[in-house]
UniProtKB/Swiss-Prot annotation:
Region (HIV-1 Vpu-susceptibility domain) residue spans: 427-455
GO molecular function: coreceptor activity; enzyme binding; extracellular matrix structural constituent; identical protein binding; immunoglobulin binding; interleukin-16 binding; interleukin-16 receptor activity; lipid binding
Result, substituting residue 65 to Y: Increases the affinity for MHCII
Residue(s) carrying Phosphoserine: 433, 440, 456
Lineage, top ranks: Eukaryota, Metazoa, Chordata, Craniata, Vertebrata
Chief localisation class: membrane
Record-given protein name: T-cell surface glycoprotein CD4
Gene name per UniProt: CD4
Location(s), subcellular: Cell membrane
Post-translational modifications: Palmitoylation and association with LCK contribute to the enrichment of CD4 in lipid rafts.
Length: 458
């Protein structure tokens, strides 16, 4: 037993003597596919000395001969390099450009009769087919890794959602907030490498919008996109379901080419107008109750499966006065929590209900406001002026009656005046005739007082 110990010691010494250089601990370095990696090798002497880099098959990659860089017959011949400026400092790095998954290997640096081993693991992370996805579609991220590795992956979306997995990660029903830079971290052997992937979610800025208008006002519908593409081509259509209609109908169809919009077909009632450039913009000449309702604009992009959607709603308000009834009405899709009110200006609401129509009987004169509000915030307002009761529609008849009475009284008055005047003239004429007769008979005693001087007693 004791005689075997010296032999084993001798065998170990012989093996160590046969080794060309001592091997230090192996380092692990993670790299990204397509990137550049730098593997370090440091000598104890701060000067340029001879070194060699080899792969696990002992095939030389590169080394030096004096101040010259020499390369071996490895597959990295055209992608391998070193930093000559660091040689005088005792640093002899191996630089590998445009990394590939198959570059994963153990690389050996021989310097000063020592060996430094570096294990390089190259990973790649790619998105499925395209990084431009329609809203609602699924995103799949696939990790490429070297054989024998067992990495874990964790990704964080722009909206802060964390997704964990192995070599495949899937995210369903992408939302607009998922558009942006995704940060993914790959962990292997307590080392990590970070990937950044830009994902563009193709969508409208708003999933739905609502427009509030008074009857007769012009309506503007806008459909801005949440992304920018230099050459955007596709086609679209707006379908509209009026509140009073039994079915929806197509209001307009259009083409989109290089951000230029051209109308293919438009209905005559209503006759929409469409802008010729992005963002998509539609104009309805007048907001009328028969147009109130909901629409759905679809946009199909070239080379993309599926369509973009945006819902748009139109609410129309009308305030009217008919005889002694003041009415406020709204048409279109409204929330049950919305409040419809009628109030006299600068006064409390006369009536306020969660309904689509309210009214006031025998309203006071003044400016009345019809208000549609949500939790105190006014969404739509229409004003109507109520005139005093004497200015009601019966005014012309009253004036006719009053005028007739006044005319009759004037006629009667004039008749009486002319009758009295005529009678007065007749009596005066009779008196003058009597005077002339008396004078002719020389009976001056019967004359008026002014003729008494010429009268003689009978």
């Amino acid at each position: 037993m004791n005689r075997g110990v010296p032999f084993r010691h001798l065998l170990l010494v012989l093996q160590l003597a046969l080794l060309p250089a001592a091997t230090q601990g192996k380092k692990v370095v993670l790299g990204k596919k397509g990137d550049t990696v730098e593997l370090t090798c440091t000598a104890s002497q701060k000067k340029s000395i001879q070194f060699h880099w080899k792969n696990s098959n002992q095939i030389k990659i590169l080394g030096n001969q004096g101040s010259f860089l020499t390369k071996g017959p490895s597959k990295l011949n055209d992608r391998a390099d070193s930093r000559r400026s660091l040689w005088d400092q005792g640093n002899f790095p191996l630089i590998i450009k445009n990394l590939k998954i198959e570059d994963s290997d153990t690389y050996i640096c021989e310097v000063e009769d020592q060996k430094e081993e570096v294990q390089l693991l190259v990973f790649g992370l790619t998105a499925n087919s395209d990084t431009h996805l329609l809203q609602g579609q699924s995103l799949t991220l696939t990790l490429e890794s070297p054989p024998g590795s067992s990495p874990s992956v964790q990704c964080r979306s722009p909206r802060g959602k964390n997704i964990q997995g192995g070599k495949t990660l899937s995210v369903s029903q992408l939302e607009l907030q998922d558009s942006g830079t995704w940060t993914c971290t790959v962990l292997q052997n307590q080392k990590k490498v970070e990937f950044k992937i830009d994902i563009v979610v193709l969508a409208f800025q708003k999933a739905s919008s609502i427009v509030y208008k008074k009857e007769g006002e012009q309506v503007e519908f806008s459909f801005p996109l949440a992304f920018t593409v230099e050459k955007l081509t596709g086609s679209g259509e707006l379908w509209w379901q009026a509140e009073r209609a039994s079915s929806s109908k197509s209001w307009i169809t259009f083409d989109l080419k290089n951000k230029e919009v051209s109308v293919k077909r438009v209905t005559q009632d209503p006759k929409l107008q469409m802008g010729k450039k992005l963002p998509l913009h539609l104009t309805l000449p007048q907001a009328l109750p028969q147009y109130a309702g909901s629409g759905n604009l679809t946009l199909a992009l070239e080379a993309k499966t599926g369509k973009l959607h945006q819902e748009v709603n139109l609410v129309v308000m009308r305030a009217t006065q008919l005889q002694k009834n003041l009415t406020c009405e709204v048409w279109g899709p409204t929330s049950p929590k919305l409040m419809l009110s009628l109030k006299l200006e600068n006064k409390e609401a006369k009536v306020s209900k969660r309904e689509k129509a309210v009214w006031v009987l025998n309203p006071e004169a003044g400016m009345w406001q019809c208000l549609l509000s949500d939790s105190g915030q006014v969404l739509l307002e229409s004003n109507i002026k109520v005139l005093p009761t004497w200015s009601t529609p019966v005014q012309p008849m009253a004036l006719i009656v009053l005028g007739g009475v006044a005319g009759l009284l004037l006629f009667i008055g004039l008749g009486i005046f002319f009758c009295v005047r005529c009678r007065h003239r007749r009596r005066q004429a009779e008196r003058m005739s009597q005077i002339k007769r008396l004078l002719s008979e020389k009976k001056t005693c019967q004359c008026p007082h002014r003729f008494q001087k010429t009268c003689s007693p009978i």
